A protein has these predicted regions:
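N-terminal targeting/tethering segments
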Residues: 1-70
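PPIase-associated folding chaperone regions across multiple families
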Residues: 57-152
Length: 152
C-alpha cells in the first residue's frame, strides 16, 4: 500500500476535494465504511481487486472490471454508496425522511421535464412513481453531503 496518498492520485481536482471528503465522511456516518481516508479508499480498492482475482482464479463469473485504477475506483465507490443510500439498502444506518404520496406527486408536478418521453410526452405519475421517489432520495443524499461540505 502507498502512504501519503493525495486526492490528485485519485483524479480528484481541487474543486471536488471538499465534496469527495464530505461524501466519504457521510458514508462513514451511514455505516457503509469505517475509514474515510484516502488510504482507506486504497485499501478497499486493493481488497476489491484481490477478491476479483481470487474469483477469476476459481473460474467464477465476475461482473464489472477485474482491475480498477484509483481514479475509476473512487468514482465507482462513490456511485455505489449513493445507490445504496437511494435504494435504502439494509446496510445503510440512517433514518430516512418519509416520502408521502403527496410529496412524490408534488415533486413530479414541479419536475415533469425529468419524466418525459423522447417525443416530449410526459410519463404518467403511476409509471414513474418509484423513479420519482428515488430522485427525492438522491436529493436527500446531496443535501446531507452539502451540509457536511459546509462544516469542512
Amino acid at each position: 500500500m502507498v502512504g501519503n496518498l493525495t486526492f490528485r492520485d485519485f483524479g480528484v481536482d481541487e474543486e471536488e476535494v471538499k465534496k469527495v471528503r464530505a461524501e466519504l465522511r457521510f458514508v462513514v456516518n451511514l455505516g457503509l465504511i469505517t475509514d474515510d481516508s484516502l488510504q482507506g479508499v486504497e485499501s478497499r480498492r486493493l481488497a476489491k481487486e484481490a477478491e476479483t482475482v481470487a474469483a477469476l482464479g476459481e473460474n467464477k463469473i465476475v461482473y464489472g472490471l477485474s482491475s480498477y485504477s484509483r481514479q475509476a475506483y473512487i468514482r465507482y465507490e462513490l456511485t455505489r454508496f449513493r445507490l445504496d443510500f437511494i435504494s435504502e439498502g439494509s446496510a445503510v444506518k440512517y433514518e430516512y425522511t418519509d416520502i408521502s404520496e403527496k410529496d412524490a406527486i408534488d415533486f413530479y408536478e414541479k419536475n415533469r421535464d425529468l419524466y418525459t418521453r423522447a417525443n416530449g410526452e410526459s410519463f404518467a405519475f403511476d409509471e414513474v412513481r418509484l423513479i420519482v421517489k428515488k430522485k427525492i432520495r438522491e436529493l436527500e443524499y446531496e443535501k446531507n453531503v452539502d451540509l457536511l461540505c459546509e462544516q469542512l
